[in-house]
């Protein structure tokens, strides 16, 4: 039985990754910051998978303590954990420092433990932020010198740090770059950017639709791609874009929700000038600004070819995510 060490197991994507690993017969060791999170995480994952081979270890991404011992005996590592804030922070280092330092810490521990392959969760925000409308692929990188916001900058710098740390060692590394992630949440807590956004859409807390369109993906597909990347031949040393080739607009998301009976989902579009004005005093509006009006498309053929991706229809993801949140 092969053991997989998983960071971010208490989060939206991490719980689905744990469930997929368990369904495929792996032993899973989940990294948690506090033992108080273990029971609710175990309960969430047990809804969709057997948890007989699930255990937890207490470690902190901001501390060196315990990491090398925690990974002992692990064949693979999934580094899914990453800090997020829907609102733009006053100090970008709140996001960037833990993302970069945590990633370096995980890779160093994995190399010390003799891990065969590490799969890192990055983002399309590490590919297209600061770029104009166009088509982008796995060789493209976000422009960290542009005003791209703290989240995109943290994902870009953390992934660059990961490649640098892994370069030249014996451990293989593969990166998954998801777009905006939708689909059912397993846990009771509304964490994760898209979960928070969906909750606001269906409860009327986003009264107007921003002019945003993004590559999107189902969370269960993201989990399957992470697990496939563990053993796929031809995956080592590569980045895989996990999202629709063409951007899906927030107007489309809202329309699917309204048609599914979520009457509070917005129907009016927010004028860009209004968002620019609001960004002066609203951190959420400020966080959206770098992506307003830009519509990137993606070269994602390698994800189909190497990882055998079979995408879930996004309308299904939107409806099932809303249903899981509104229970």
Predicted regions and their residues:
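Mid/C-terminal beta-alpha module of Rossmann-like enzyme folds, strongest
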Residues: 213, 225-286, 305, 314-327
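Glycine/proline-rich active-site loop of Rossmann-fold NAD(P)-dependent oxidoreductases
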Residues: 168-171, 183-196, 229-240
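Conserved Rossmann-fold NAD(P)-dependent oxidoreductase catalytic core, especially the SDR/UDP-sugar
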Residues: 79, 83, 89-149
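A conserved pocket-lining segment of Rossmann-fold NAD(P)-dependent short-chain dehydrogenase/reductase
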Residues: 88, 144-147, 181, 188, ...
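Active-site Tyr-X1-5-Lys
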Residues: 146-173
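N-terminal Rossmann NAD(P)H-binding glycine-rich loop of SDR-like oxidoreductase domains
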Residues: 4-26
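NAD(P)H-binding glycine-rich loop region in Rossmannoid oxidoreductase-like domains
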Residues: 36-40, 46-101
């Amino acid at each position: 039985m092969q053991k997989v060490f998983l960071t971010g197991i208490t989060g939206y994507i991490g719980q689905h990754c744990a469930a997929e690993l368990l369904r495929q017969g792996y032993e899973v060791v989940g990294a948690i910051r506090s033992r108080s999170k273990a029971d609710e995480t175990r309960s969430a994952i047990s809804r969709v998978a057997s948890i007989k081979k699930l255990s937890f270890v207490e470690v902190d991404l901001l501390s060196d303590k315990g990491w090398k011992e925690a990974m002992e005996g692990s064949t693979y590592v999934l580094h899914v954990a990453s800090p997020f804030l829907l609102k733009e922070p006053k100090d970008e280092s709140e996001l960037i420092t833990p993302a970069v330092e945590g990633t370096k810490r995980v890779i160093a521990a994995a190399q010390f433990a003799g891990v065969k392959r590490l799969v890192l969760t990055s983002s399309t925000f590490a590919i297209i932020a600061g770029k104009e409308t166009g088509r982008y692929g796995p060789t493209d990188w976000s422009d960290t010198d542009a005003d791209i916001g703290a989240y995109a900058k943290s994902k870009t710098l953390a992934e660059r740090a990961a490649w640098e740390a892994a370069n030249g060692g014996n451990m293989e590394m593969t990166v998954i770059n998801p777009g905006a992630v939708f689909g059912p949440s397993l846990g009771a807590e509304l964490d994760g950017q898209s979960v928070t956004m969906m909750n606001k859409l269906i409860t009327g807390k986003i009264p107007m639709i921003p002019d945003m369109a993004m590559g999107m993906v189902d969370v269960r597909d993201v989990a399957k791609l992470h697990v496939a990347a563990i053993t796929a031949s031809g995956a080592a040393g590569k980045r895989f874009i996990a999202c629709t080739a063409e951007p899906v607009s927030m107007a489309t998301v809202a329309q699917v929700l309204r048609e599914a009976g979520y009457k509070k989902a917005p129907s009016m579009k927010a004028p860009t000038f209004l968002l620019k004005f609001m960004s002066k005093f609203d951190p959420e509006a400020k966080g959206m600004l770098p992506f307003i009006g830009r519509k990137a498309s993606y070269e994602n053929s390698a994800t189909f070819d190497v990882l055998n991706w079979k995408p879930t229809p996004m309308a299904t993801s939107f409806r099932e995510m809303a249903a899981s949140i509104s229970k």
